[in-house]
Amino acid sequence: MTPHDKVMYIIQQLELSDSKVARAIQKSVSSATHKRMRLRDNKFTDEDYQNIRAFYLEKLRSIENLEEENTP
């Protein structure tokens, strides 16, 4: 699976908009859109994959920690 395929999988699984992807990969919305649509052969890079993965894993961990905080 290429980095582009991995990012596309994350986008599909989390139903992310281009603006949310842009924030996670620290690029402009138009850049995220071009990469998603593969315009002018733009693709998500390994750096994009690492950024989006880290961004959303951190968010999921904070959600998971909510359960631990409520444990007596």
Say what each PLM segment does.
Residues 9, 34, 61-72:
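Short, charged recognition helix plus adjacent turn
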Residues 1-14:
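A short, Lys/Arg-rich alpha-helix, primarily the initiator
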Residues 19-23:
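Short alpha-helical "recognition helix" segments of helix-turn-helix
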Residues 46-63:
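DNA major-groove recognition helix of helix-turn-helix/homeodomain DNA-binding modules
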Residues 27-42:
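Recognition helix of helix-turn-helix/homeodomain-like DNA-binding domains
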